[in-house]
Each structure stands twice: as structure tokens, then as C-alpha cells.
């Protein structure tokens, strides 16, 4: 079986790379999408969620924030602000981030950036969900 090369990139560089991907399943703004070797060239907006990476002897989940994908016949590039494999998620740290975001949202302080706090809460909840998939 032909396989796909997957590269997940953040502003800090490449955080996940694999050459033997049989299929990657991800959530785009248009819905769930599966990418396999030979996929037609595609660019799509990605929403906060997870990427399920299927390979010969198993699968992995990676928590990702909003971003974009570019699929070519033999390569999938995912460009996001943050990405973290489920196996590397620090659940306690994610719980602290969730608590911090919730307290910012409850705060009546005019200096609180509500949209930023909502995004932080969404990322923390996503990391906690993906950690459970591991």
C-alpha cells in the first residue's frame, strides 16, 4: 500500500512528522475529511480538534488548533498555531489552563479579552478530550 507523508507545523517549527501514514482524518470547517495517498490536491481550513493518524500497526491522535491543510498526492501538510500528540499532553497542565480560562471568562474586569479567554478554554478542553483518546 502506498503511504502518505504527514508534516504538522506550528510557528515553532515541525512538531510531528511521519512517512508511513495510511490515512489522516481531520475536522475542517466544511466537515470531517479523510486524506489518503493519491488524494486530489486540496487546501482547506482546519478547526480546533484532533487529527487521527492511521498507519500500518496502529493510530495516533494529535490535538490541533485552527489552521490550514494542504494535501497533495503523496503529502499532507498541516499548518496550525498549536499541535500536541495525545501521548505528550500534560493533563494537569491542561486542567489548570481550563480553570484559568474559565476564571478569566467569569471576571468582570474590563481588561479581560473575552475572545482570547474563549479560545484558551476551547484549546484546553480540546487537549483534555484528545488526551482521553490515547
Swiss-Prot record:
Gene Ontology MF annotations: ATP binding; proton-transporting ATP synthase activity, rotational mechanism
TM stretches of this protein: none
UniProt organism field: Staphylococcus epidermidis (strain ATCC 12228 / FDA PCI 1200)
GO cellular component: plasma membrane; proton-transporting ATP synthase complex
Compartment(s) where it occurs, according to its Swiss-Prot or TrEMBL record: Cell membrane
HAMAP family, per database record: ATP_synth_epsil_bac
Stated family: Belongs to the ATPase epsilon chain family.
Positions in coiled-coil regions: none
Superkingdom of the organism of origin: Bacteria
Membrane topology: Peripheral membrane protein
Covalent S-S links between cysteines: none
Keywords of the record: ATP synthesis, Cell membrane, CF(1), Hydrogen ion transport, Ion transport, Membrane, Transport
Gene from which the chain derives: atpC
Subunit structure of this chain's protein: F-type ATPases have 2 components, CF(1) - the catalytic core - and CF(0) - the membrane proton channel. CF(1) has five subunits: alpha(3), beta(3), gamma(1), delta(1), epsilon(1). CF(0) has three main subunits: a, b and c.
Function as written in the Swiss-Prot or TrEMBL entry: Produces ATP from ADP in the presence of a proton gradient across the membrane.
Annotated stretches, region: Disordered: 94-115
Name the record gives this protein: ATP synthase epsilon chain
Main location: membrane
NCBIfam families, per database record: ATP_synt_epsi, PRK00571.1-3
PANTHER family (UniProt xref): ATP SYNTHASE DELTA/EPSILON CHAIN (PTHR13822), ATP SYNTHASE EPSILON CHAIN, CHLOROPLASTIC (PTHR13822:SF10)
Amino acid at each position: 500500500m502506498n503511504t502518505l507523508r504527514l508534516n504538522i507545523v506550528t510557528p515553532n517549527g515541525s512538531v510531528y512528522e511521519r512517512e508511513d501514514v495510511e490515512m489522516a482524518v481531520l475536522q475542517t470547517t466544511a466537515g470531517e475529511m479523510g486524506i489518503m495517498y493519491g488524494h486530489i490536491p486540496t487546501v482547506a481550513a482546519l478547526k480546533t480538534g484532533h487529527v487521527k493518524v492511521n498507519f500500518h500497526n496502529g493510530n495516533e491522535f494529535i490535538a490541533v488548533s485552527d489552521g490550514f491543510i494542504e494535501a497533495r498526492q503523496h503529502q499532507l501538510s498541516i499548518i496550525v498555531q498549536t499541535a500536541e500528540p495525545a501521548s505528550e499532553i500534560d493533563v494537569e497542565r491542561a486542567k489548570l489552563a481550563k480553570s484559568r480560562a474559565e476564571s478569566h471568562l467569569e471576571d468582570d474586569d474590563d481588561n479581560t479579552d473575552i475572545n482570547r479567554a474563549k479560545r484558551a478554554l476551547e484549546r484546553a478542553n480540546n487537549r483534555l478530550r484528545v488526551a482521553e483518546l490515547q
